[in-house]
């Protein structure tokens, strides 16, 4: 079986590399034609795709997947409509490929500039969410990259159904069907091969829990753009407008629990904790959110709060649980975020411009937010159309990774017979 998995992955890799050589020079109109054909194929096959998703959901329930995982797995008609809208948005995006920037003459008479080009072949490993299959595929096609998708075994039927529509659209447009491939085995050995096939794959994008990210980081022989967990914070500073702070902190936690940009720890300045905490605790109680707090939080709110442990400050709950800490001010809040956070998305609520600027400068996260919910940390909300992930790395791409994050630049030199003296 091991040999057959290796042979299968080698074939997938070779097909992706061959497809990437065609895609890299595909015109914008051809790529958009393919994406439009994919849109039509998805529309025509909505019932079949949702039925495939229900098979995954039934398996998930029988395997006792937790509610957060099931929420991410489910494709409702509304979410399917959102997927289609995301695809429309990608079609409307400006194609970055071939763009030449920084063109300038040198004293020798040559012109030097930079041209934006595809990365080549992207390998993506992700869990649960079948909508990621379409988002990643559409961004890869638009940016001229081939992509190999390894979704979670819990979403295999959904991913295969979506991939069929994608293949149909590529075929209609005359682009290689293997530009987008879903690995159709749940064997974990496939991941091991994917992250070490340097001859075929140019970059790996893992989206998932710490164990997945650690495995990929430790074993990959290919550059990695990590999408780590989202241990996000909101700090309600002493000069916050509480009419803003209440809806922001409620939305950041309860809008959707099982997403990486949901707040997991609430930090409150000690100067307003006595006033603010009882109000927000009442709103959380209505949503049945369990609070785990520091001793000062417990003193203010009483026995409705469970004691927080050191582990709670590090935890991405992905559910109706929230850690709460009262801090002495902005310095302690920033220190806490930089120590316990995952460098994903963190927010401050304040009317003090100087402190807001300080927070923006000192918090070491891919997205830093002032007076808004952490839930805005998303490629669609940032105007990227869709995202392949939210990078918590600092090299190449950081934050939501859209079209430009799937490209690099090469130097171009334009001459008229010049030789080096």
UniProtKB/Swiss-Prot annotation:
It comes from the Bacteria. One of its GO terms (cellular component) is cytoplasm. Its EC number is 1.2.1.41. The keyword Amino-acid biosynthesis applies. Keywords: Amino-acid biosynthesis, Cytoplasm, NADP, Oxidoreductase, Proline biosynthesis. GO terms for biological process: L-proline biosynthetic process. It is found in: Cytoplasm. GO terms for molecular function: glutamate-5-semialdehyde dehydrogenase activity; NADP binding. InterPro entries: Ald_DH/histidinol_DH, Ald_DH_C, Ald_DH_N, Aldehyde_DH_dom, G-glutamylP_reductase_CS, Glu-5-SA_DH, GPR_dom. It catalyses: L-glutamate 5-semialdehyde + phosphate + NADP(+) = L-glutamyl 5-phosphate + NADPH + H(+). Belongs to the gamma-glutamyl phosphate reductase family. NCBIfam families: PRK00197.1, proA. This is Gamma-glutamyl phosphate reductase. It comes from Acinetobacter baumannii (strain SDF). The lineage of its organism: Bacteria, Pseudomonadati, Pseudomonadota, Gammaproteobacteria, Moraxellales.
């Amino acid at each position: 079986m091991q040999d057959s998995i290796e042979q299968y992955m080698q074939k997938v890799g070779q097909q992706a590399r061959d497809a990437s050589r065609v895609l890299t020079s595909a015109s914008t109109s051809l790529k958009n034609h393919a994406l439009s054909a994919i849109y039509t194929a998805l529309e025509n096959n909505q019932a079949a795709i949702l039925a495939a998703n229900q098979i995954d959901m039934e398996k998930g329930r029988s395997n006792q997947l937790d509610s957060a995982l099931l929420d991410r797995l489910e494709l409702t008609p509304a979410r399917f409509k959102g997927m289609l809208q995301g695809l429309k948005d990608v079609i409307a995006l400006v194609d970055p490929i071939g763009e030449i920037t920084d063109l300038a003459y040198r004293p020798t008479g040559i012109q030097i500039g930079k041209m934006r080009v595809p990365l080549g072949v992207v390998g993506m490993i992700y869990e649960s969410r079948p909508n990621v299959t379409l988002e990643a595929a559409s961004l890869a096609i638009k940016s001229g990259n081939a992509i190999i998708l390894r979704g979670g075994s819990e979403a295999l039927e959904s991913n295969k159904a979506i991939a069929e529509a994608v293949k149909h659209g590529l075929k209609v447009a005359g682009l290689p069907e293997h530009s987008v491939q879903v690995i159709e085995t749940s064997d974990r050995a496939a991941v091991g091969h994917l992250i070490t096939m340097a001859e075929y794959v140019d970059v790996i994008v893992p989206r998932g829990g710490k164990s997945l990210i650690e495995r990929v980081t430790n074993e990959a022989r290919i550059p990695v753009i990590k999408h780590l967990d989202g241990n996000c914070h909101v700090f309600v500073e002493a000069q916050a407008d509480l009419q803003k702070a209440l809806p922001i902190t409620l939305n950041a936690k309860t809008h959707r629990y099982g997403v990486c940009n949901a707040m997991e720890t609430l930090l409150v300045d000690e100067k307003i904790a006595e006033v603010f905490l009882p109000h927000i605790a009442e709103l959380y109680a209505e949503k049945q959110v369990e609070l785990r707090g520091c001793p000062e939080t417990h003193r203010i709110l009483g026995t409705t709060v469970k004691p927080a442990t050191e582990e709670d400050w590090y935890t991405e709950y992905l559910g109706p649980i929230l850690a709460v800490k009262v801090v002495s001010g902005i310095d302690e809040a920033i220190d806490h975020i930089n120590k316990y956070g995952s460098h994903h998305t963190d927010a401050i609520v304040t009317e003090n411009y100087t402190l807001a600027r300080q927070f923006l400068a000192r918090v070491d996260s891919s997205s830093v937010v002032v007076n808004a919910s952490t839930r805005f940390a998303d490629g669609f909300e940032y105007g990227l159309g869709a995202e392949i992930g939210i990078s918590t790395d600092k090299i190449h791409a950081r934050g939501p990774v859209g079209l430009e994050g799937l490209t690099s630049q090469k130097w171009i030199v334009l001459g008229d017979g010049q030789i080096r003296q």
